[in-house]
Amino acid sequence: MNTLQSGVLVVDKPAGVTSHQVVGRVRRLMGTRKVGHAGTLDPMASGVLVVGVNRATRLLGHLSLHDKDYTATVRLGVGTVTDDAEGDVTVTTDASAIDDRAIHAAMVRQTGEIQQVPAAVSAIKVNGRRAYAKVRAGEDVVLRPRAVTVSRFEAIAIRRHGQVIDVDVEATCSSGTYVRALARDVGADLGVGGHLTALRRTRVGPFDLTAACVDIFAQDAVTPTPMTMAEAAALSFPVVHVTADQAAAIRVGRRLSFTVPAEVTAIIAETGELLALYRPDDEKDGQSRAICVLV
């Protein structure tokens, strides 16, 4: 690949692989070090991981803010230190007496605009250190609740196995939501503990599994073809097309003499090139200012 070429890949990350390993594989296949991803997926999880190559890495912070879809399995009756199947068991409780109606009601209480305490084993920094590093060192970690939106959280199937209950769920939630924490909190609400045994991300904003590139971990994997930055931006944000004269000013980050339609708006030249992301100017009515210039 020409290292000046930039674009976005949608990778279907397999379970058992870290997000960083996906980045490493893309670096080797694409022949460039400048690769990043939008929104980490835990090693046990599979599904959509949006990857930026070269200049497209500058889009990732904005792409990661989209809402996301997941399918998952919640096991009720067992809690773990990580809130998923990777961690040590912290509690076991007979969940067999819990009926389906109670499960649905507990899930409803985790729907909408909620205050969620993130999973303790997470990449959130506490006093300059990652929370997961503190937990692994045996330190107590107290994370503050954060506002998240869970617009959909539904049970698709409920399966009973002795003292535990497995609930297959589908969820749509805002950036920053921990599905592991939803499992934990449903279990806590029901008084039996809960954790995730499976997690698959099926969508990040406009990017879903149908857009996933070839299997990059196959032995005979070929260099994937990324979508252009303009294509990715047009899927993700409102678009404003500008003239050649306007494009010249945008290339140096000047204000625009009109208000763009959204807090993140893609500016595309007559040539089809993505020039920048702009937002309305809070200080000057009727103008817009650059979030980032991409050329």
From Swiss-Prot:
<dbReference type="InterPro" id="IPR036974">
    <property type="entry name" value="PUA_sf"/>
</dbReference>
<feature type="active site" description="Nucleophile">
    <location>
        <position position="42"/>
    </location>
</feature>
<dbReference type="GO" id="GO:1990481">
    <property type="term" value="P:mRNA pseudouridine synthesis"/>
</dbReference>
<dbReference type="Pfam" id="PF09142">
    <property type="entry name" value="TruB_C"/>
</dbReference>
<dbReference type="InterPro" id="IPR032819">
    <property type="entry name" value="TruB_C"/>
</dbReference>
<dbReference type="Pfam" id="PF01509">
    <property type="entry name" value="TruB_N"/>
</dbReference>
<comment type="function">
    <text>Responsible for synthesis of pseudouridine from uracil-55 in the psi GC loop of transfer RNAs.</text>
</comment>
<comment type="similarity">
    <text>Belongs to the pseudouridine synthase TruB family. Type 1 subfamily.</text>
</comment>
<keyword id="KW-0413">Isomerase</keyword>
<dbReference type="GO" id="GO:0031119">
    <property type="term" value="P:tRNA pseudouridine synthesis"/>
</dbReference>
<dbReference type="InterPro" id="IPR014780">
    <property type="entry name" value="tRNA_psdUridine_synth_TruB"/>
</dbReference>
<dbReference type="InterPro" id="IPR015225">
    <property type="entry name" value="tRNA_psdUridine_synth_fam2_C"/>
</dbReference>
<dbReference type="GO" id="GO:0160148">
    <property type="term" value="F:tRNA pseudouridine(55) synthase activity"/>
</dbReference>
<dbReference type="Pfam" id="PF16198">
    <property type="entry name" value="TruB_C_2"/>
</dbReference>
<dbReference type="InterPro" id="IPR020103">
    <property type="entry name" value="PsdUridine_synth_cat_dom_sf"/>
</dbReference>
<dbReference type="GO" id="GO:0003723">
    <property type="term" value="F:RNA binding"/>
</dbReference>
<protein>
    <recommendedName>
        <fullName>tRNA pseudouridine synthase B</fullName>
        <ecNumber>5.4.99.25</ecNumber>
    </recommendedName>
</protein>
<dbReference type="InterPro" id="IPR002501">
    <property type="entry name" value="PsdUridine_synth_N"/>
</dbReference>
<keyword id="KW-0819">tRNA processing</keyword>
